[in-house]
Structure formats: structure tokens, C-alpha cells
Amino acid sequence: MFSDICDYYVDFGYKKSHQRYKSISKITIHHMGANSNPIYCAKWHRDDKDVSSNYYIGSDGSIVGGVSEDRRAWSTGDEDNDQSAINIEVANCSRGPEWSVSYEALVSLLALCIDICKRYNFRLNWTGDEYGSLTTHNMFAQTICPGPYLMNWMKDISLNVNKYLEEYK
């Protein structure tokens, strides 16, 4: 199962995932670490890496479904988080130290977060740690992911998603 706002899909089937045993109640944000085409990144994860994600967002704002939402992606290295989270990879439009993302990617990230929260009936709560319903990869592993640029957007993402959900009940 994927969001209706997906532009493309890369069928992972049962690869690089496990069945969920928890309900979806959070979103975890990642960065690609490159300005990768989201279809290419999803296929690379599916075919060559021991990682996966539910969604991939390109710098052009395109959204690609990877691991179906009814399955747990291998994203953070923390099974408990991945069991309850939808994991989203976002392409970077610049490299470090900022690892910025494009305006189009941010707009698509907001739209996807809104859609997920609506369908699973939860609000985003940015606490800055693993206990919120909006989390980041670096909360579970020694990594810079999702990078300073997206980290600086987390509170605003949470506030804007919740504002939209409240206004358009």
C-alpha cells in the first residue's frame, strides 16, 4: 500500500523488509546524501544495499514508493522505530556540511507527511528525540542523516503539518 500522491513505484516485494507488528504512529526523515534520482535510489536500495525506505523524494518533488506501508523498511537500524514509522528519504541539492534540499522536495515532504498523518490518524510531535512522532535517522544511529538543513526544518514541518490537519479536518 502506498500514498495516492506517489508519482512512481519501485516494487520491493518482500525484499529488505519485514511484516509490521505495530501500528503506524510516526514518520522518520532521512536524506539521500546526494542529489539522486529517487527511482535510482530506490532501485539501488532494493538491489544492492541492506537498507530500504517506504518513500523516496527527488529534488524535483517527485515521490517514489519503495517498501509498501504494510511492511517495515530497514531504515534506521532500530527495529522498534521502524516497526511504527513510515521512513522517507529526501534527495539533497547540495553536499555537506549543510546537505540542503530543494523547495520542491520540502513541499512534497510536507504533502506526504500530511497524507500519512491523515490516513493513520496521528499528529506530528517534534520533541527532538526518539520519543516524538517525527523522528530522524540520527536519533537511532551514529550518522549525520538527515543533515543540518533538514534538522533545522523539523519543528516547522511538525507545526505546518499539524496546522493543515487542524484547518482541513
Which ranges hold each PLM region?
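N-terminal catalytic cores of peptidoglycan-degrading enzymes
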Residues: 1-82, 145, 168
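Basic/polar, cationic surfaces and motifs that engage anionic cell-wall
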Residues: 1-21, 94-169
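Structural preference for beta-strand elements that scaffold enzyme active sites
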Residues: 26, 85-87, 133-135
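Cell-envelope and extracellular/periplasmic
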Residues: 33, 84-98, 139
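Short, charged/polar low-complexity linear motifs in solvent-exposed/disordered segments
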Residues: 81-84, 160-161
